Amino acid sequence: MDALTTPAERFDALPAFPWTARRWVGAATRGLAIAYLDKGPADADRAFLCLHGNPSWGYLYRKMLPVFLASGARVVAPDLIGFGRSDKPVLDVDHSFDFHRGALLEFIDALDLHHVTLVVQDWGGLFGLTLPMEMPERFDRVLLMNTAFATGEVTEGFRAWRAFSNSRPDLDVGALFRRSEPTLSAVEVAAYDAPFPDARYKAALRAFPNLVPDGADSPGAAVSRAAQAWFGSAWRGQSFMAIGMKDPVMGEPAMQALRRSIPGCPEPMRVHAGGHFVQEHGGSIAEAALASWGGR
């Protein structure tokens, strides 16, 4: 698989993000490297696994990571292949639901994560929520933000986003973040642009909107329905939900539907100033989640 790696200097001096990434290659990644953060004690009694979506990367969790680390936990934040500091396939068609899901399953096994709190937003949840049923002994909690089960049903808001994305093969990532979170500084916007020097690096950005299952037989839909059913019948872990209320695609209606699929999920934290990328308000979300779980 032909791929590009974003030059390391584009990630120099990232604001509020001092962590150096590790790189991992597994059988499921087809020779490509996943860049990831692995911080905190390796032998901690619990771990936070933070999964981002499109078109972001681990930088989106910069306000949540310090809160999780301060609790004494191990904290792991991978960049999906095609994003952040991970390798980037050149061809749009190299991306598939099963490819990314399989890479995450192998990654979790390789790092031997236990007592995991799964922290997800956007595609982090579309992939991530299908993982616990495959390895239930590893997962204890979920922290849900502006995401969904990818069961094959999509909203008109999503269809509008997909049409917008498909009309922009060289998507201006920084402009998208500025529109969603107007308080971002110029250097923060530049950090979201950093992984993508030009259109050659943006195959994942072009592919992902078209990977969202939009029919019952779409790739990923069946496993997502199975995951939804598993949560409904077998999940006994704790949960916390935060909603970026300004999200036009995965806002409160979508999140309330998700909440109904997670037994015991409490009333959500509503972040009225937050949009789709609600982790930009993540410090208070992480603190509230930990408080609801007794500070751990």
What positions do the PLM features span?
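Conserved serine/cysteine hydrolase catalytic core
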Residues: 201-260, 270
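Conserved hydrolase catalytic core segment
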Residues: 114-153
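Catalytic histidine-centered segment of alpha/beta-hydrolase-like enzymes
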Residues: 274-284
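The conserved beta1-alpha1 loop
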Residues: 49-53, 121, 243
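Helix-rich cap/lid subdomain of alpha/beta-hydrolase
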Residues: 151-208
